């Protein structure tokens, strides 16, 4: 029910965006599950996450993408349920070890015969370092901070464009000036020095 004080345009947009029958719901669900897949596997089912149109690349596994999108819609657009579905799949739970019998016919892992190794995000690296050292403060909620010495999870870092956190930038923290569909991945000497 639209709020009588507002025009109802945002509600109409949200309804259209999630309407799988007459709106953009099917496409929105495909885009969203592709982004989730990309987050967990470092590469989406569609490798151009910001372009599902004619200029983008076609999905490597279209049936899987459609099935995941339908599961997402059927779950009531429940992100937690989608993460659980992906993370409990046999594909996610595979070893990342190289198997010669599978590598010969599919050297680029197109058929996902192994879990693809990939770099962790800056936030995950920092949080794991704090957890392993026993310093991680697991307190939830509250204000963000610019204090590099804080021991809370990295999600609580405040983003200030003029005062970025050097460690995070060194580990490919995303540029806050633009919207990115994929994070840059670099391997440079300063990253190795940072980990010493």
What does each model-identified segment do?
Residues 1-151, 156-158, 168, 174, ...:
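Primarily short, surface-exposed interaction patches in extracytoplasmic proteins
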